[in-house]
């Protein structure tokens, strides 16, 4: 009687895969114009999620909670109450700066 012992081997080695190795792209949030900085109308002051900093005088809020300047002027960050912050833009007399 003929008995055959037949063993089949894989022709490619099995390679384990990692469950890591991916990450989301950074959103580049944060303050873009600092306190005392001159900004033009439309310039972004803060990119944020939620209203960590609230819009103050002459500052608008976009649909993604981005704060932007409505007029040309100087940015001022202010504290309102105990735990609230706001960003405002105040107009600057250009002739006073030139002198």
From Swiss-Prot:
Record's comment on post-translational modification: The N-terminus is cleaved by ribosomal processing cysteine protease Prp.
GO function terms (MF aspect): structural constituent of ribosome
Family classification: Belongs to the bacterial ribosomal protein bL27 family.
GO terms of biological process kind: translation
Positions of the propeptide segment: 1-9
Listed name of the protein: Large ribosomal subunit protein bL27
InterPro entries: Ribosomal_bL27, Ribosomal_bL27_CS
Entry keyword set: Ribonucleoprotein, Ribosomal protein
